[in-house]
Each structure stands twice: as C-alpha cells, then as structure tokens.
Amino acid sequence: AILSNGDNITLTRVVELFETEQVVRPFERQIVRNETLPEGETRLVQAGVNGLEEITFRRILEDEVEISKSAVKTVVLIDALPEIVMVGAQASYTPLNIPGTLAYLAGGNAWIMENSTANRRIIVSTGDLDGRIFSLSPNGEYLIFTRKSNKPADEEINTLWAVRTRNLDPKLISLEASNVVHFAEWIPNTNSVAYSTVEPRSAAPGWQANNDLYRVSITGGTPRKLLSTSSGGVYGWWGMSFSYSPNGKLAYARPDQIGLVDQDAGYLKPLLDITPLNTHSDWAWIPPLVWGADNESLFFVSHAPAPAPITSEESPYFDLTAISFSSEATVALVQSAGMFSSPSVSAIRSTGREKIFQVAYLQSIFIEQSDTSRYRLMVMDRDGSNSKLLFPPADSNGIEPQTPAWAPQALEGQTGDFIAVVYQGNLWLIDSGNGDAYQVTGDGLLSEIDWK
C-alpha cells in the first residue's frame, strides 16, 4: 500500500508460543458379568488408576492478548488403568445332571461342567482365547485351544495350547504351533493332536492357507508332517478342514472337494467334487463335514445347482448329504438346509441287534440367504427320516451358525440325548427325544462349546 500524508500506521506485535501441560487422564469403569457370583453381588477385581498425558499447545498472542490456543501434540506419559467390577449374574436355573465333560468358552476363558450344570470350574483364565480352536479329547481329559498372539496380526495370528481338564490346578501346555485357523483335533486312541496352519498376511482375510497337516504329541517332541503344503484347489488361499472318525480315519473338506487322507503315505484321495461357492468377497465356503458314529458314513453339506440363469458357482442352495461306504451310495438327505447346516452325530445306541445313531443339523430360516440367515436346530435319523424341529420354536429368533454338541451318552430315564447349543450368548441343553429345552447360563458371554 502507498501511504499518503496524514495516514496512520498501527503495529501489532504477534508472538507464537509453545507450552506443555500435564493433564490427568481419568480411568474408565468396566463391568464384567460373572455367573460364579450371586445375582446383584459386586466385587472389585481391579482398582482404577488415573493416567497422565502431556499436551503441547500452540498459543498466538497479539499485543500480549491471546487470540488462539490449540493442541498440536499429545503424549501419553502413564496409561490409565481401568476399574474392573465383577457383577454377579448367577441366575436360578435348575441344575441338570449331565454325562461326561462339557467345556465352554466365555469371555476369553475356558470353563468346564462335570456331572451337573451346577458344578462349574474355570480351567483357563488368561482371557485371550480366540475361539478358532476349542476341542476336547475323545475322553474329555484334555482341551486344546488357541490363544491370541501378542505379536502383530501380520506376523502371528494365534498359538495352540492344551490343558488337562481334571487337574484342580491346571497347567497350560504349549504345543509349539502357531497360526492355526481352521483345524486342530485330537487323534482318536492316541496322545497326539493334528493341526493345519496358515501364513499371516496384512491383506484380507489376514492369511494365506498352507493346506498342510501336522501331528504333535501332547508329551512334546518334534511335529511330524502328515500333509505337505499345497495350493488347496479352487479358493485354496482360504484353507481346508478335516474330520476324524471315531476309529481314526481322516476325511478332508475344501471349497471344491471332499475326500479321505492317507495318513501314512501323505496324500489326498478325492471322493466327491463340490461346486465352489463364489462369495464375491474375501472369504470362501468350506463344506461342513462329520463322520457317522459307525465309521462307515460321512455327512456333509453339498452345493446344489440353481435354475438358469443363476450360475452353479453362485447358487444359493445347499443340501445336507451323506456318503455310505458300506453301500457305496451318495444321497441328499435334506434339500436346501443351508450352507452352515453343520451336521453333528450322536453316540451309537443299540436297539436289539441294530446299532443306530441320530444326526443333528441346522436348518436355515431364509433358504436363499443362508450365508446371513439364522438357523433352527433339527434332528433326524441317520437315513434322513423322522426329521423334526427341536429349537428354538418357530416364533422365536433363530440361532447363529455353529456345530451342535451331543452329550456323549444318554442319562437314565431320558427320552433322547442332550444336545448343547449357544443361543443369544448362553448355553442351552435340548433333549433330542421330547424337545424340552433348558437354559443353563445367563451372562450372555458364551461363544464356543464342546462335549465329550
């Protein structure tokens, strides 16, 4: 600007200052429901401690008058420690006698029930179980499970562990295996566990499957390779799963195939090609698969075709199917059951000279949206006859996809066997004979179950 005679000039002194202040970070209050405490009772688990942070402010002063103040940097000096209060959630559910050992995962911890649903005992209290693997040994004496890794997810997803369920002071046993996402299971009639691994990745879904299989003894030693790393067929990047028969035969399922594993020679023996599902997403569908209690049959979910113009890979229909090795027959037992029907077989019962067992499975409520649908628990005879709805009732919300867990044997005087399911975060037991359903837990934290 050009100044003229008589113009006034005002000079403003501007000062920029940086100052730091230490500010208290108040602790949060966390409430944890616990069924070991009576309803309404509270217990302080961890006292809260305030944290401390250092904030750097940028101040602008004009002629010693502050016109702005803004935070430009925050550094946490001391992390706040949350106050954790345990609140009793012990509801007055009638105790039930149960056979065997029932294990369940709640709030990242492993619990077991024995003899009665009133007898509950925590066996793993680390709070970091991720639920990918949660399986009892055939005799219920050991539980194998996975724990979240402390390393970044693109370096290590989880680690595989075991614990003896019958010790009053259980000690965790590291199986020296990591990145176990799809499968780990006790090998029948041995003291060993079989497992399959993946390689962590930063991109979705978070891993690249190895489609391998290892065997490791619970007593230690070097794992033995049963299957070498392979591409795994169509959508093999997602992975594959396996299932042991009661007498130790091994079947496999992958997105495009089911078959048997030669555990001595280390190769796959395909039984049936499956039309792989195109999910148009970063996950793949693996057919749920289980052996019959007779060691001579396989129950699995197959991908059924759809009418034109829907392509076979995009068909929304999935049938519950069985293979009988004794009759060399493959039969669709339930049409349009849903992709997560997850069959589960009961223990064998003897009726005269005949040995029979039942099959529990899930029926999708919305047949053409079974990937997002809720389900209802059904039961049928092994040949697909006498199918009936068990739980929940038709006028109630369905259950989330899961594999039902049969009781290892029936109780005296019981019309059927108990089947355990997770419903709305709680454990329910359903009598397969008369359909009576019993709620066992009430804290809403339960996510996985197994029963042996």
Residue ranges with predicted function:
Residues 89-452:
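Sequence signature of WD/YWTD-type beta-propeller architectures
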Residues 1-94:
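Extracellular modular ligand-binding repeats in secreted and cell-surface proteins
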